[in-house]
Every structure is written in structure tokens, then in C-alpha cells.
Amino acid sequence: MRGGKQPRRDPDDPRRTLGATGEGLAARHLEARGFEIIDRNFRTRQGELDLVASDARFLVFCEVKTRIAHGEPGPLGPLAAIGVRKRRQVRAMAREWLGARAPDARFDSGSPPEIRFDAIGLTLDAHGRLLALEHLEGAF
């Protein structure tokens, strides 16, 4: 969407449900790897940060893309939807998050860790079961 107001968020929109399912699976994936989820769905003027996580080394801003598999998987997975514009948008949202939330965030080392931008792509079957998860650390 360009400029202006963002469209109203319909809680019954199937895309919203799919996104929430994917974000939950991605959060569990990160937690299983030792990350603490410190924020979810942080709203900014540019959009919404999906997940913010931290461990002793990194503060990770994570973009999550979830798709339903229809037949045979194609050559491009969910992560193909993260183009140049989206990467720029996530960086801008991260700056906004840092200004608003970083002073209140608690980090194990006492100081903020190194910042990293990850991407997690999930493919689900028609019943919402996880078929594939791809996690790109330092994706952009």
C-alpha cells in the first residue's frame, strides 16, 4: 500500500489467521534455538514487525512469510515474497522499535546485542500442518 491510511484489519480474514499461525510456529522455532521472544506484531507507521527476539549475542528482527501448499511445491518458497521494498520497510520498522522499546528491553548481557535481520518462511498443508520451515539468519 502506498501512503495514506492502512486498511482496517479484519480479524476474520483468512490471511490474518494464516499469518498468526505462521508467526506462532516461527516463534516456537526461535525459542527452541534459545531465543526469547521479546515482542510480536509491533505496529508502526510503515507496517507491522512480526517478531523481535533476543539471545546473548543477537537482537533479531524477524520477518515471517507463510503460504499454503497447493499441489506440488514450486521453485520459489514463501521467502521469495521478501523483496527490496519489504527489506527496507523492515529496517525502518526496526529503527522505530529501537526508539520506542529498546530502552525498556532487558538483555542478558546488560547491553543490547548485535542486530540481525532474519526471515522465516513456512509452508503449510491445507489443514494447517507444517510441511516446511526455512530460516535464513542474517537474511538482509
Stretches with model-predicted labels:
Residues 66-126:
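Catalytic cores of nucleic-acid endonucleases
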Residues 36-59:
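Active-site metal-binding core of divalent-cation-utilizing nuclease and nuclease-like domains
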Residues 30, 51-71, 90:
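Conserved catalytic cores of phosphodiester-cleaving nucleases, focusing on short active-site segments
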Residues 9, 102, 131-135:
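Short, charged, intrinsically disordered terminal tails
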Residues 119-140:
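Short, low-complexity, polybasic intrinsically disordered segments
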Residues 13, 17, 21, 46, ...:
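Residues at secondary-structure transition points
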Residues 1-40:
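Acidic-basic catalytic patches of nuclease active cores, encompassing PD-(D/E)XK
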